[in-house]
Amino acid sequence: MPRLTDATKAARRAQIIEAAISCFLEKGYTNTSMSDIIKASGLSSGSIYSHFSGKEDILITAINKRLNNVKELYETLPEGAGPQDILETIHTNQLVNDNFSAMLRIRAKSLHAPEIARATADTMPLLQGIIVKTLTPWAAEQLSVLHEINPNSAQRTPEQEALIADYARDTADAFMMVFQGYMLRSFFGTPKEKDRLYRVASALLPE
């Protein structure tokens, strides 16, 4: 039997993940069996288990893949992008919206599944770290005006660097609270409401 190429392996893994997500959305994580995933994927059990140890492994990989998608999206933002810029980018990105909705539906159908809790335990800290990194140049620019922070990073004092880090972190937390509220409200609202909800959320964030 010929060895699979890296591209084929990646395609198989993606095929398995998408099949599993479809099952999780339909039945809930708890009620989905590996047999369900195998059937939905159209692959053999041997093929599935050559890539993943079980459905929790698939779930963790799916979440990490979606985090990587978010990270890649943030990396497309120009240096100095602020909270409103980030929200606009997310608002107009269908992949992020679809991923958020899918994860919310999976979580809602399996609220008490310990595997879900384990798989998502690091999601918030990782997401916060991505946002903090994105907002740090913006925070430095804002504080250089408000607090006379030196715009040249090589000439800043440790106290100034700490102030920038705190401001970026606090703004990231504020952004995450507004963003999650906006996405949750949009999820339970109508498609026609989404643009209005985006404008409301954007108005709550600094430029």
Predicted segments with their positions:
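Helix-turn-helix
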Residues: 15, 19-57, 61
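Short, basic, alpha-helical segments at the C-terminal edge of helix-turn-helix-like DNA-binding modules
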Residues: 64-69
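Hydrophobic alpha-helical connector segments
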Residues: 61, 72-100, 148-161, 171-172
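Residues in soluble alpha-helical coiled-coils and helical-bundle/repeat scaffolds
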Residues: 39, 53-57, 61, 78, ...
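Hydrophobic/aromatic-rich alpha-helical bundle segments in the mid-to-C-terminal region
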Residues: 117-121, 142-207
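Short, solvent-exposed amphipathic helices
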Residues: 119-133, 137
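Amphipathic alpha-helical segments used for helix-helix packing
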Residues: 96-121
